[in-house]
Design a protein with these regions (language model features):
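Compositionally biased, low-complexity intrinsically disordered regions
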Residues: 806, 812-813, 819, 835, ...
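Condensing-enzyme catalytic core of the thiolase-fold
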Residues: 1-786, 793, 840, 861
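Basic polycationic patches enriched in arginine
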Residues: 789, 793, 801, 812, ...
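Long, low-complexity, intrinsically disordered segments
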Residues: 842, 846-862
Length: 862
């Protein structure tokens, strides 16, 4: 597939040493090192309690260094009156939100547009590290301490909501979503934004990344992985480099189709020629980079751009300062650039550390400035480079030099992330043709979105303690899954997750340290493992809707107790009452992108893979992205999932304030669908469970499901599993079509049928999905059971099942550190109503909805 070039017409950033692109270029060009220690109380616990630089320091509950790349001076340059939202609406939000909206505002204004003035349809794709922010940790701690007064509950939804706030603050109305592909996130975001432009579903896209995750969590986590620099120095490609140094901030680009940018006389900062994406699949492990995976991303980029590696005259490397990672990158590049010499390489991380989900976009801004200045800037701390470089095609830029080359300046930018996520972006300077009408390069132009129907050929559900066939039974007889617990609250709670040890490729000891969120999705996928194992490994993607797991905030609370309890034994006991210490396996088991990438390793799937966060629309947006990639021919199959275990104290507290009444019935769910192009599914002899028509226009007799007005809200039946809720509606629509029944249990036998899923989400986001069920057949319980129930495993006389709790034990804080407001009512403590915050997502209960021409019966309460 050829890549239609995309123009970069705007840029903005909020980064260490770079509160604007000009300031960032000055930092890079002048060779400044802007790393340092955090401001006082930045971590919520004194550094003396956490920093241990001794060689024998334990790997958990401590960090080897507090040095990082910190955003400084932001309050002096941020003006909340510059946005379409009232300044009060931005008050109380975590800095993550504010960095993102400010960097994106800069980018739009550099393109010549103020908020609300962007031409055509404009959207957002945001790379966002879905670890908790400090504000989310504060929120969770207050919930557990029973002191909820004054909480800004929006900080609970820090995975997808920042993109929604960006769209509202800037007047971008063509959809806003976030994703997590670890360190490759911002280049993944740029690629997916280009896809929107290519298929003409948007005219302008704002794309990039932000990292506002808890800096304490990153430092302790990277120490547990033995990846943090003990010296606090970021030294890419140095022979003595001892690890990475985390950084925070945001960086964004404004993108348009090149033809549109030229026609409108936009200032073109550069041109994206291609972005190649891949995953390592099984590779060497979730944390170990793979040459083969990195090479696939690079080769794909050059193939799509119709360029050769020798066209590149600068490489902005991923190079984080980890010896294995840097060497692997050099080795994979050496294969691609074999036979060439003297290729300049560098890394912005030597200046400001590793900004993780923002790093690729930050590198792109650096390269754009270098092209404009005609200067290749230096990389710091490379006085003793890795020996491999001496006989490689590459040379390190130790000082600034003129960027002279025979043709247009072209650069490659690498991003490689945990979980095997790889990205390679090709960037070209824009040279204005002497005659705009006759001297334009002959670039490929992609047509609007191809018209392939997409087939759903596999489905697996876990809802509470029910699996697919049981969920189908509940839908058929209108029997709710949520039931009342001892507190009188109705929940669809998952009490346990079980995995078959003969199926999993992960050591049981590691799985025991993995959060139930990851285990639930893995369990759902393993229930249809034979189907997934038959998919083409090189061209199958994994795209999963999810949100930040609030359980991860327990770690921050665990570490903060060190400032409250002096006695070591009492401190150890108190900490264990919150959560166990973080080991390397525990870090991986809580890593947000691993929710998707664990399936890459399990099934050796090597297509582009990532998690998607759009709050209630997370799973359906994952579905939409996978369908787009299938229609474009970039992949041949996709495993699409969504997971959320919402029966959890912190989420429930936030839901009571910000979500509608139906969405306050918490549910736990994991959903997995398998997609192919419909023609391929028929060729392969797959059973087509439903199709996603290309035109997405409903025809025939329609069943309306969802949370939009006029649709049937299934939360009373299935519970509300927040980030999984949208895809759960899709799965329910598939099941209703296969069962041949309406939700009231009456037969649905029309030849032309459709399911319309209409969804509303936080901050006004909306989405509609249309499904076409197969021709109706008589309901056959045995046939459906055989299709939906996992195949029986051979009996060996010994159980091969591993059982894991569906939730962590309740948080137990010592009485002397529990807040004085532990009995405060949730209702009394709401700082503002959901309506006042503009956050309520609409929806109506089953009893009041006419989801077809005539509603006959409604589910019974239980």
């Amino acid at each position: 597939m050829k890549f239609e070039p995309i123009a970069i017409v705007g840029q903005g950033c909020v980064l260490p040493g770079g509160l604007s692109p000009d300031e960032l270029w000055k930092t890079a060009h002048e060779g400044r090192d802007v790393l340092g220690s955090p401001p006082p109380d930045y971590w919520g616990v004194s550094a003396a309690q956490i920093v241990r630089d001794e060689k024998n320091a334990p790997f958990f509950d401590h960090t080897w260094s507090d040095r990082g790349g910190y955003v400084r001076g932001f309050d002096e340059i941020f003006d909340p009156r510059r946005f379409l939202l009232d300044a009060d609406e931005l008050h109380g939000l975590d800095p993550l939100y504010l960095w993102a909206v400010e960097a994106a505002r800069q980018a739009l204004e550099s393109a010549g547009w103020r908020p609300g003035e962007v031409p055509g349809s404009a959207g957002v794709v945001l790379g966002n590290l879905s670890y908790p922010t400090k504000s989310m940790t504060d929120l969770a701690e207050n919930v557990w301490r029973g002191s909820e007064h004054g909480i800004d509950w929006r900080n609970r939804f820090m995975s997808g909501l920042p993109a929604h706030v960006m769209s509202n603050a800037l007047g971008l109305t063509a959809g806003a979503t976030a994703l997590d592909a670890a360190c490759a996130s911002s280049l993944y975001a740029i690629k997916l934004a280009c896809d929107r432009l290519h298929d003409r579903t948007a005219d302008v896209m704002v794309a990039g990344g932000v990292n506002g995750a808890s800096d304490l969590l990153l430092h302790v986590g990277f120490s547990a992985l033995q990846a943090l620099s003990r010296t606090g120095k970021s030294r890419p490609f140095h022979s003595g480099a001892d690890g990475l140094v985390p950084a925070e901030g945001a960086a964004f680009l404004v993108l348009r189709r090149l033809d549109d940018a030229v026609a409108d006389n936009n200032t073109i900062l550069g041109v994206i020629r291609a972005v190649g994406l891949s995953n390592d699949g099984r590779g060497h492990g979730l944390l170990v980079p793979s040459q083969e995976g990195q090479e696939r991303a690079m080769r794909l980029a050059y193939e799509m751009a119709e360029l050769e590696p020798q066209d590149i005259s600068l490489i902005e490397c991923h190079a984080t300062g980890t010896s294995r990672g840097d060497l692997t990158e050099l080795m994979s590049m050496a294969r691609i650039f074999h036979g060439m010499v003297n290729i300049p390489i560098g890394s912005l991380k030597s200046n400001l550390g590793h900004s993780i989900t923002a790093s690729g976009a930050a590198g792109a801004i650096k390269v754009l400035a270098a092209m404009r200045a005609g200067v290749r800037p230096p990389t710091l701390h490379v006085d003793d480079p890795l020996p491999f470089i001496a006989d490689s095609p590459f040379r390190l830029l130790t000082e600034a030099e003129p960027w002279v080359c025979s043709g247009p300046r072209r650069a490659a930018i690498n991003n490689f992330g945990f979980g095997g996520n790889n990205a390679h972006l090709l960037l070209e300077e824009w040279v204005e043709p002497a005659d705009k009408h006759h001297s334009r390069p002959n670039f490929p132009v992609t047509s609007a979105q191809p018209d392939d129907d997409i087939a759903i050929v596999g489905i697996s559900l876990l809802v509470g303690d029910d699996e697919t066939a049981s969920v189908a039974d509940h839908l058929k007889i209108c029997q709710p899954i949520p039931s009342c617990d001892g507190s009188g609250t109705r929940r669809a709670r998952m009490t346990e997750v079980w995995l078959d040890v003969t199926q999993t490729r992960f050591p049981p000891v590691d799985l025991k340290q993995t959060l139930p969120q990851q285990l639930a999705l893995l369990g759902a996928a393993l229930n249809i493992d034979e189907l997934i194992k038959g998919l083409p490994p090189d061209t199958t993607s994994v795209v999963v809707g999810m949100g930040c797991d609030a359980e991860v905030t327990r770690l921050g609370v665990r570490w903060r107790l060190a400032d409250e309890i002096d006695d070591p034994d009492q401190l150890a006991a108190a900490r264990d009452g919150v959560v166990q210490g973080w080991t390397a396996a525990g870090v991986v088991g809580a890593m947000p992108n691993i929710v998707a990438n664990r399936l890459n390793r399990q099934f050796d799937l090597r297509g582009p893979s990532f998690t998607v966060s759009r709050e209630q629309l997370s799973g359906t947006t994952a579905l939409e992205m996978a369908a787009r990639a299938l229609r474009r021919g970039e992949v041949d199959a996709a495993v699409v999932g969504a997971v959320d275990l919402s029966c959890e104290q912190v989420h429930e507290a936030a839901a009571r304030v910000l979500l509608g009444s139906e969405e306050q019935i918490p549910g736990d769910a994991a959903v997995v669908l398998v997609l192919k192009r419909a023609d391929d599914a028929r060729r392969d002899g797959d059973t087509v469970l439903a199709t996603l028509p290309a035109d997405q226009e409903p025809h025939g007799e329609c069943l309306h499901l969802g949370t939009a007005p006029g649709a049937l809200n299934l939360s009373p039946l299935l519970g509300h599993a927040h980030a999984a809720s949208g895809l759960l509606y899709v799965a329910a629509g598939v099941l209703y079509g296969l069962l041949g029944v309406w939700p009231d249990g009456t037969p649905w036998t029309s030849e032309k049928r459709a399911v319309v899923i209409a969804l509303n989400a936080l901050a006004g986001q909306e989405q509609q999905i249309v499904l076409v069920p197969p021709a109706p057949k008589p309901y056959d319980a045995d046939a459906l059971g055989g299709q939906f129930r996992p195949a029986a495993r051979p009996q060996t006389g010994k159980s091969t099942r591993l059982h894991f709790p569906g939730h962590l034990p309740d948080v137990r804080l010592p009485t002397h550190v529990v807040g004085a407001h532990s009995s405060v009512s949730h209702q009394e403590e709401q700082p503002a109503s959901a309506a006042e915050l503009g956050m309520v997502s609409a929806g109506q209960p089953i009893a009041t909805i006419h989801y077809r021409h005539q509603s006959r019966r409604t589910p019974k309460d239980s």
